[in-house]
Curated annotation (Swiss-Prot):
<dbReference type="GO" id="GO:0046839">
    <property type="term" value="P:phospholipid dephosphorylation"/>
</dbReference>
<dbReference type="GO" id="GO:0042577">
    <property type="term" value="F:lipid phosphatase activity"/>
</dbReference>
<dbReference type="GO" id="GO:0008195">
    <property type="term" value="F:phosphatidate phosphatase activity"/>
</dbReference>
<dbReference type="GO" id="GO:0005789">
    <property type="term" value="C:endoplasmic reticulum membrane"/>
</dbReference>
<dbReference type="GO" id="GO:0033383">
    <property type="term" value="P:geranyl diphosphate metabolic process"/>
</dbReference>
<dbReference type="GO" id="GO:0016020">
    <property type="term" value="C:membrane"/>
</dbReference>
<feature type="transmembrane region" description="Helical">
    <location>
        <begin position="229"/>
        <end position="249"/>
    </location>
</feature>
<dbReference type="InterPro" id="IPR036938">
    <property type="entry name" value="P_Acid_Pase_2/haloperoxi_sf"/>
</dbReference>
<comment type="function">
    <text>Magnesium-independent polyisoprenoid diphosphatase that catalyzes the sequential dephosphorylation of presqualene, farnesyl, geranyl and geranylgeranyl diphosphates. Functions in the innate immune response through the dephosphorylation of presqualene diphosphate which acts as a potent inhibitor of the signaling pathways contributing to polymorphonuclear neutrophils activation. May regulate the biosynthesis of cholesterol and related sterols by dephosphorylating presqualene and farnesyl diphosphate, two key intermediates in this biosynthetic pathway.</text>
</comment>
<keyword id="KW-0256">Endoplasmic reticulum</keyword>
<dbReference type="InterPro" id="IPR000326">
    <property type="entry name" value="P_Acid_Pase_2/haloperoxidase"/>
</dbReference>
<keyword id="KW-0472">Membrane</keyword>
<feature type="active site" description="Proton donors">
    <location>
        <position position="214"/>
    </location>
</feature>
<dbReference type="GO" id="GO:0006720">
    <property type="term" value="P:isoprenoid metabolic process"/>
</dbReference>
<feature type="transmembrane region" description="Helical">
    <location>
        <begin position="133"/>
        <end position="153"/>
    </location>
</feature>
<dbReference type="GO" id="GO:0016787">
    <property type="term" value="F:hydrolase activity"/>
</dbReference>
<dbReference type="GO" id="GO:0006695">
    <property type="term" value="P:cholesterol biosynthetic process"/>
</dbReference>
Amino acid sequence: MPSPRRSMEGRPLGVSASSSSSSPGSPAHGGGGGGSRFEFQSLLSSRATAVDPTCARLRASESPVHRRGSFPLAAAGPSQSPAPPLPEEDRMDLNPSFLGIALRSLLAIDLWLSKKLGVCAGESSSWGSVRPLMKLLEISGHGIPWLLGTLYCLCRSDSWAGREVLMNLLFALLLDLLLVALIKGLVRRRRPAHNQMDMFVTLSVDKYSFPSGHATRAALMSRFILNHLVLAIPLRVLVVLWAFVLGLSRVMLGRHNVTDVAFGFFLGYMQYSIVDYCWLSPHNAPVLFLLWSQR
């Protein structure tokens, strides 16, 4: 049988009023038979003081310590200063730019393709028997034969129109040598590893490969000849074919990478635009033509 309900003082709720008649109006009992009311208020106050776990969690989440993301025990300790940032050179670039990735990929493809096309790089290569012919083609695009040939023709020319064309051809060759030497000295890209340094009459900057001087000269001379010499169509095709094969031979001999030759063609094409814009004539350079005619 259930136990009788007891009050806050431990007495049964059903005791007679005579047992507490010694203090009928006592405040402890609420006075005047209000014992049940006191017991009801006591139960309410005890329930109100109880801790609700849900409310406790909400209050903890709203506390400033929890909002800062640190534990309450750690917040009670001494504050720690943040770690100093790493130096700029020690940081790892985890987000490389698209341009950097594209350039690295292009460089890898360039080196791989140049090595595959270097079939005449040595006598023991797959096309080593064609190497002497490629070296002869190399001489046809060298700067010294072109300079000597232009000077000889300029000295032998007896017409003003011929001298004008040859004077500008000499200007184009000197401009080509100057620009190629300047870019090679600035870029300083080494020649391919499979190249043999047995080239014809090299200078100090010829140990660098970017850009290809033979490619720039081939593009410049072919465009110059096609614009200032009246040639039949087969000869015009032969000039273009010579320029293309000369550039290809630079890769087959292992002298240059593919990008060296490609940029050389572009540079030579643009060099002729400079020469055509600064075209020398007896009208804009009379002193130069007068001095040359007196020789």
